[in-house]
Amino acid sequence: MKRQKAVSGERTPCEKRLFCICWDIVEKDMIVLLIIKNNNDIINNMNANGEKMILDKKLYDNYVKILENELVPALGCTEPIAIAYAAAKAREVLGEFPDHVEMRCSGNIIKNVKGVTVPNSDGQRGIDVAAILGIVGGDASRELEVLESVKQEDIEKTRELAAAGYCTCTLQEDVANLYIVAKVCKGGHYAEVTIINRHTYITRIVKDDVVLFEAAVSEESSNYVDKSLLNVKDILEFANTVNIDDVREVLKRQIEMNSAIADEGLMHPYGAQIGRTLLQVYGDDVKIRAKARAAAGSDARMGGCSMPVVINSGSGNQGMTVSLPVIEFAKSLFCTEEQLYRALVVSNLVAIHQKKYIGSLSAYCGAVSAACGSGAAITYLYGGTYEDISATIVNTIGNVGGIVCDGAKSSCAAKIASAVDAAILGHFLGRKHHWFQPGEGIVQKDVEGTIKSMGYIGRVGMKDTDKQILNIMIDQVKVD
């Protein structure tokens, strides 16, 4: 986004309308008066008292690295891609085309792969398809873009091998939520690759009973970042003071890639067409566009679109949810590129902050935590204070905190639309000084306590929910 030029001495539309809208709203005879002031204190890295705001360098560098590590491109839904990556890596280690492949996966992986179209597969679905395609045409060196180089003959061979029972998959119980083992065999030889906790984090490589590589699940590698340092107050200070050049590359890529797949989802009939339906039925007000574009990106991604997405917290759907609504509101408010980047810092880090309590995969729908991030960023664009942004987050959690994840599939787009709608409502409630009070459900005395409560529900409270969802999906329980 380019800053709009103004005649000398005039303010741009954004400076006239946006930064900073005071939150003392005076209502009289149904007319709302907004008191607007310049926001140079934020752009010039000053706080409200005119003091220079400087984060501790360790904290600053950690926040930059979190964004660099988390905001990476992925081709297709990340769970089938992780399976393809593990299988492709196992074949690479074996050194020849295997006779068959055996997959052992956690329930959450099975749940998130069962109903989603594998990218670059010509509409095929399932763990076996993801694993076989990774073996046949995958490039393990590309990690989350492992299937980018797949050719048509690879797709046809995958279809044949899947029909012949080339790949088997078993449920591995009592393991991490994100757990994948790919074992490929040829004659009397085999290779096995294990991934735990992160979609590309290989913890063990074995060939013919010889351990070639092993890493502790909690090992602090060169890419380690301390997410425990995240909190809403410091996130806002970081967003206000960060040198944009330190985050420009990752955020520019997020804007470009995620906007492109949203366009694709609106132009073509993917999935349940949630994004297209929203615009057709409700019009193109910014509040509708914010929901529709995020949903459309998910329509395309869940429908097997091979376009890359910049993810958040290991999820493409969450990556689109934290970014696309913010981009739409920034456009409607005539924001500069810098203002958009600072808002995206808020949305991405707020979402990651919440997910660190929930975990990578859970029965808790990640669209909610991502929408909390985009809602916080929208409030930030309107000049909201820490208290205002906290109110948006709490209002969103209090509204849609109970949405469950029953796997990656077309309905994810609808859940994204619902979560973003709740975040926008939470924002406008906060503007009118309305928010859910401590003691109402899981709402605590402050935003950090409420985020922790939500995380506890997702990580601990929904464990059995997760198990029962999987039982229903794989027909292991009779529902009367």
Regions found by a protein language model. Name each.
Residues 73-89, 307-324, 365-369:
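Conserved phosphate/anionic-ligand binding catalytic regions in large, soluble enzymes, centered on
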Residues 162-304, 469-480:
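Signature of multi-pass transmembrane helix bundles
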Residues 74-78, 108-112, 119, 196-200, ...:
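A structural signal for small-residue-enriched, beta-sheet-centric alpha/beta enzyme cores
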Residues 21-45:
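Short, positively charged and aromatic/hydrophobic N-terminal segments
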Residues 81-180, 184:
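Early transmembrane hairpin of solute transport permeases
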